[in-house]
Amino acid sequence: MIRLECDYAEGAHERVLRRLFETNLEQTPGYGEDLYCARAREYIQQLCQREGIDVHFLVGGTQTNTTVIAAALRPHQGVIAATSGHINVHETGAIEATGHKVLAVPSADGKLTGREVRRVYESHWQDATREHMVQPGMVYLSQPTENGTLYSLAELTDLWETCQDCGLFLFVDGARLGYGLMSEACDMTLPDLARRCVGFSIGGTKQGLLFGEALVLSHPALRRDFRYHIKQHGGLLAKGRLLGVQFCAILEDGLYFELARHADRLAMELRRAFETRGYEMLFDSYTNQQYPILPDGLLAQLEEEFALTVWSKVDGGHTAVRVCTSWATEPQAVQALIRALDRWEET
């Protein structure tokens, strides 16, 4: 079985495993106060080309999103997100469990716009009964989106300026940030992102680490006492150096971005293969996640050899699936899927 349903089916890049083994018996301070976490923070600060930022390391994406959103919002506030946003559909109500409502906004492509955010904000403040409603206090988006689509630099800038006008925090979930930044369609850099939000994450779990997300915070209100919030939400890892070692290994010479570029390149090869054979795509994705619409008969045949994620039923005879490459996907796996498409065409 060739697994192309997600980007976390493999363990970790061999360099990461080697560094963990080499440092295994070293004795270091706990809770991220070690030299490896310090070095990884320096790498990230240099990549962001921005002073006045704090970098924290957490184990997973849901933990990261929940901790930062709960820290940013007052008890009566909620976070604006696209209906398809990860915190709204794939985190088991984690945000709501902290007492904060997700204010979901419909979006065909998974992206929010400054206009939509302003509409939600003004709708609340123009309502005479607003004190009986959840107040918007934050905007959540991911780059890339849950649908593999990308925000342009202009779109992100518009959202950032809107949030500043409205007094809203803007947070960017970067669980797949490398795949977004290395996409052929991406026109922004990491420093661009770092200057247009109050915080963002740099995903490792889906991009070559065993586990781990780096959280970058720039707003003073979020930076203050943030380690208290991490501990309260169960995220302050006693053996925190395991996160620092991994991020050092993958960031020190651009390996993180090289692996992301590899996944994107293979995903685009698959997209071209689907499109040249007449299959439409559900979303216009230029990242490692592709969403072809397939005849149900073809899907049944593919599922004998490949693990794919069924995304949505399109009509009585067609289904959209997610085909996902990763940092570790072999070119042979992509070629095997393309050959399977050709066999179907020949029947």
Where are these regions (language model features)?
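Conserved N-terminal alpha-helix of the aminotransferase class I/II PLP-enzyme fold
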Residues: E14-G61, T83-N88, A94
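Conserved PLP-anchoring active-site segment centered on the Schiff-base-forming lysine
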Residues: A71-V89, R118
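Conserved C-terminal alpha-helix-loop-beta "cap" of PLP-dependent enzymes
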Residues: R74-H76, M268-E345
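Hydrophobic beta-strand scaffold residues
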Residues: V79, V102-L103, L170-V172, M281, ...
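PLP-dependent aminotransferase-class I/II
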Residues: G99-G137, L141-E146, Y151-D158
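Active-site C-terminal subdomain of aminotransferase-like
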Residues: A108, Q135-P136, S142-T145, L150, ...
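Catalytic PLP-binding core of fold-type I/II PLP enzymes
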Residues: Y151-S183
